[in-house]
Amino acid sequence: MAAKEVLFGNDARVKMLAGVNILANAVKVTLGPKGRNVVLDKSFGSPMITKDGVSVAKEIELTDKFENMGAQMVKEVASKANDAAGDGTTTATVLAQAIVVEGLKAVAAGMNPMDLKRGIDKAVIAAVAELKLLSQECSDTKAIAQVGTISANSDESIGDIIATAMEKVGKEGVITVEEGQALENELDVVEGMQFDRGYLSPYFINKPETGSIELDSPFILLVDKKVSNIRELLPILEGLAKTGKPLLIVAEDVEGEALATLVVNNMRGIVKVAAVKAPGFGDRRKAMLQDVAILTGGTVIAEEIGLELEKATLEDLGTAKRVIITKDNTTIIDGSGDQVQISARVSQIKQQVEDSTSDYDKEKLQERMAKLAGGVAVIKVGAATEVEMKEKKARVEDALHATRAAVEEGVVAGGGVALVRVASKIKDVEVLNEDQKHGVVIALRAMEAPLRQIATNAGQEASVVANTVKNGEGNFGYNAGNDTYGDMLEMGILDPTKVTRSALQFAASIAGLMITTEAMIAEVPQDSAPDMGGMGGMGGMGGMM
């Protein structure tokens, strides 16, 4: 086992803080409408330019093991915020840094770290409850566009295109982001259905650059059982070979000999085929298979209704314009089902939603209804160069996550104002001692940090801006985009409640752990062994007499 180096007390905390500051300082320059870009070196291809906090955080690895531990813990804050809400990573990092800096000062002054942490936790619980009270519903297209615009670094075209996409496919519809070919952003809306089952074998992949399978005008075979014997599929495969069209098999499972034979046939180019598991489980799987059948104009081959796979013909198969399969998802685009039957199926599911008493069942039924009635919207990001394309695509994805979060939990005033208002309302949180009270104060100070950073990035004096906003009421705040003060909601500066809440909770969680750290252990770096020296040359023979 390699030797370890151990640091205690203040020595450990100083090193950890240095790492936190390096990472947070690199991330926080991107915050707000006047935040700057960060350039990331890539081992191949052109450098990546980004304004996305989590992308910057993920790139950072420090040489010093102890500093790196601090940096990695703050990286975790950004990653967690990104996973939960898809945005707010920079805000989370700024909050974490503010709590750690103030917390470690208090620990150095002799306060009890555990009580400080408890005080911070109490303040955060109160703040989250207060945020929910401040939150307003986000349902109209204008508000959705404003949220998207703010998240995409004040790019109105991105906010508008996301709002249009949501309007067309519904808030539950599937929206994907792709790299486009033009200079401008484009929106394609295609009727379709997506479900969370990927390919059963990577050998079906025909688009290695994206790791996906694309089938044009395929037949779709729907089977409500496991398929393991290839003989059952032979009649269908022989009929298909004559048409030259690809086949998608959706079954409970395809395994053993059947899967192996399909893979071999596909690789040899005899039949273009792909197989995926049917979505859902039990009765829900039967219902979802029926949904796919109605959407594609096919029939579900199920023994309980007297249909056998061996006797199936091409008439039993559904068809679609296109099918795209990744390792996680299958999207059926433009199924050729009868529109009247699709509408009837949607009405039937709507009735089931009204009759259902379980929230879980309602949610799943609404999901099915959205997939049948909605469609798939594809936002194609346009840019002049590949470097700009990557940067813009990341912003569009962030904005899409933010708008989904806004629809889910509502919106609050943006620009760091919501946290400032929350802080003013929770000053009197109940605590047990002075150290816990100071923990609450640390959390309240940290809640001003995002507003201060937005002002700093806009070239303003942070303290002046913070005091002006604190002296105001309600949604009064600072618009860094045009350097004015006013009502943030009226100016269209909104943040999703979920994003603000997640940022605060994850920042406080990890910062609290860092404040209570008393020792750090890391491996001692190994010096590489010196190379073996070359052998000395042999002396020459003496001259002969």
From Swiss-Prot:
Entry's Gene Ontology cellular component terms: cytoplasm
Molecular-function annotations in GO: ATP binding; ATP-dependent protein folding chaperone; isomerase activity; unfolded protein binding
Reaction equations catalysed: ATP + H2O + a folded polypeptide = ADP + phosphate + an unfolded polypeptide
Gene3D superfamilies xref list: GroEL, GroEL-like equatorial domain, TCP-1-like chaperonin intermediate domain
Subunit (UniProt): Forms a cylinder of 14 subunits composed of two heptameric rings stacked back-to-back. Interacts with the co-chaperonin GroES.
Enzyme class: isomerase
NCBIfam families (alphabetical): GroEL (TIGR02348), PRK00013.1 (NF000592), PRK12849.1 (NF009487), PRK12850.1 (NF009488), PRK12851.1 (NF009489)
HAMAP family: CH60 (MF_00600)
Species classification: Bacteria, Pseudomonadati, Pseudomonadota, Gammaproteobacteria, Alteromonadales
Family: Belongs to the chaperonin (HSP60) family.
Pfam families found in the cross-reference section: Cpn60_TCP1
Protein name per Swiss-Prot or TrEMBL: Chaperonin GroEL
